[in-house]
UniProtKB/Swiss-Prot annotation:
Keywords: NAD, Oxidoreductase. GO terms for biological process: alcohol catabolic process. It comes from Drosophila virilis (Fruit fly). The active site is at residue 151. Substrate binds at residue 138. InterPro entries: ADH_Drosophila-type, NAD(P)-bd_dom_sf, Sc_DH/Rdtase_CS, SDR_fam. This is Alcohol dehydrogenase. GO terms for molecular function: alcohol dehydrogenase (NAD+) activity. The gene is Adh1. Belongs to the short-chain dehydrogenases/reductases (SDR) family.
Length: 254
């Protein structure tokens, strides 16, 4: 899908990968970029507006751990203003296996709840126009970093949820694909806690291996948005965009 003249909501669009992706998105000329984030960053918002003054960039404070009803209320405000929204990017994430409940709440439940809320406006069974969802998951959803099993499991859950959304598109009219970054040089990975402190140096050990920059990841993210392939599992790793073929080991046959 061409980004030009589209209305986009980006949850966590001011984070490490998020901010660089927001920069790349505004360069492509959407009509509106609505950023929902827990922490306001007026400097970053001003920068995004300056990159392309023709794009309307707005910010709303948002914590993905709030109840679905609160998210629906916020989205009602946004939809009333924009009339239509073309793309939702779910990008919230934390990497800290000391915070077990919050890791699951942000990385998985938050994605589910935000998606559930926007269905109120998009679901074609309710007369909605449909839409597109891009969920930022992780390569750890393919193969875990076993020292951070809670984080890895939360991302695997988000990936499975996204795959199901794509299969439900004929019913809901909402398509979906996953964005799965490899190890990217962000503040998230420089220092983080392993589960039960099984490996205090896990962040340092990861950074001893090849990584990618947030800009490389962001540029490939935009390519994935433009490809707009329902059900795609995109691996964004070492500056490359790779379409992953998922191996089916079991089928419900329904």
């Amino acid at each position: 899908m061409a980004i030009a003249n589209k209305n986009i909501i980006f949850v966590a669009g001011l984070g490490g990968i998020g901010l660089d992706t927001s920069r790349e998105i505004v360069k492509s000329g959407p009509k509106n970029l609505v950023i929902l984030d827990r922490i306001e960053n007026p400097t970053a918002i001003a920068e995004l507006k300056a990159i392309n003054p023709k794009v309307t960039v707005t910010f709303y404070p948002y914590d993905v751990t709030v109840p679905v009803a609160e998210t629906t209320k916020l989205l009602k405000t946004i939809f009333a203003k924009l009339k239509t929204v073309d793309l939702l990017i779910n990008g919230a994430g934390i990497l800290d296996d000391h915070q077990i409940e919050r890791t699951i709440a942000v990385n998985f439940t938050g994605t589910v709840n935000t998606t559930t809320a926007i269905m109120e406006f998009w679901d074609k069974r309710k007369g909605g126009p449909g839409g597109v969802i891009a969920n930022i998951c992780s390569v750890t959803g393919f193969n875990a970093i076993y020292q951070v099993p809670v984080y890895s499991a939360s991302k695997a859950a988000a990936l499975s949820f996204t795959n199901s959304l794509a299969r439900l598109a004929p019913i809901t009219g909402v398509t979906a694909y996953s964005i799965n970054p490899g190890i990217t040089r962000t503040p998230l990975v420089h220092k983080f806690n392993s589960w039960l402190d099984v490996e205090p140096r896990v962040g340092e050990l990861l950074l001893e291996h090849p990584t990618q920059t947030t800009l490389e990841c962001a540029q490939n993210f935009v390519k994935a948005i433009e490809a707009n392939q329902n059900g795609a599992i995109w691996q964004l790793d070492l500056g490359r965009l790779i379409s992953v073929e998922w191996t089916k080991h079991w089928d419900s046959h329904i």
